[in-house]
């Protein structure tokens, strides 16, 4: 793939005509610098040029923007450092859920349901939101362990037990749902999102009448990105959480339940 070198060539012409102080570069990662786990050789050469291996021996500021996620910016920066054979700082990384930091002030002390993100290591996805400053983060694993019949098709994984928050959810009033990253269990996560959007005062296991639901605004739900598709090393693009995939599936189920 030749995207990276073409980008670099344009960048050097820009820097020579406008000066270094006005130039910075933002890279996408998936499909541009990497193809699945494979780092493109052109990408490594481009990063080296930005690090000063260029005719002017000058560094050019750059950052990475990706709709990937599921780990902290610091961990992602370490991974990218290994990939591109240079030091990448955490503040050079903007992931799908980095934007959720902007909601910290509003929901810092509010109970929120986090959906999606890697299940391993257990509790790691919750830890990312907590590192942003959210203090009451609950997961689908927590709800499933609290009431196994709420999603009877699978059992809560024993490997998740050390990371579970075991609380009485009849006393928790959820205020928002965060789709942190791509769901690993669409059926369960759609079920719980619809449950909370139809719940009385955000209490899991309660339900308003359809008339009350139609009169009220549903619980806020925030998606970390809007991708329908994303690419990896498989030959066909994969469905994401955004427009047309998980979100549309959730909206369709909620619409049917609200009108029923």
Located regions from the model:
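HAD-like aspartate-dependent phosphatase fold
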Residues: 2-260
């Amino acid at each position: 793939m030749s995207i990276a070198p073409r980008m670099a060539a344009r960048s050097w012409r820009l820097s020579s005509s406008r000066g270094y102080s006005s130039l910075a570069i933002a890279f996408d990662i998936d499909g541009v610098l990497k193809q699945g786990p494979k780092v493109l050789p052109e990408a490594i050469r481009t990063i080296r040029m930005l690090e000063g291996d260029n005719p002017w021996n000058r560094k050019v500021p750059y950052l990475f923007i990706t709709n990937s996620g599921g780990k902290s910016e610091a961990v992602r920066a370490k991974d990218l450092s290994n990939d591109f054979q240079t030091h990448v700082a955490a503040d050079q990384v903007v992931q799908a859920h980095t934007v959720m930091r902007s909601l910290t002030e509003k929901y810092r002390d509010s109970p929120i349901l986090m959906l999606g993100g890697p299940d391993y290591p257990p509790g790691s996805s919750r830890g990312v939101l907590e590192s942003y400053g959210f203090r009451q983060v609950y997961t689908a694993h927590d709800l499933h362990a609290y009431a196994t019949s709420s999603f009877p098709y699978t059992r809560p994984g024993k490997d998740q037990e050390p990371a579970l928050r075991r609380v009485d959810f009849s006393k928790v009033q959820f205020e928002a749902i965060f789709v942190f990253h791509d769901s690993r269990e669409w059926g369960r996560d759609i079920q719980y999102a619809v449950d909370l959007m139809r719940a009385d005062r955000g209490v899991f296991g309660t339900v308003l009448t359809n008339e009350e639901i139609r009169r009220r605004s549903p619980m806020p739900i925030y998606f970390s990105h809007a991708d329908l598709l994303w690419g990896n090393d498989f030959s066909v693009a994969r469905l994401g959480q955004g427009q047309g995939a998980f979100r549309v599936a959730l909206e369709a189920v909620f619409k049917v339940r609200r009108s029923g």
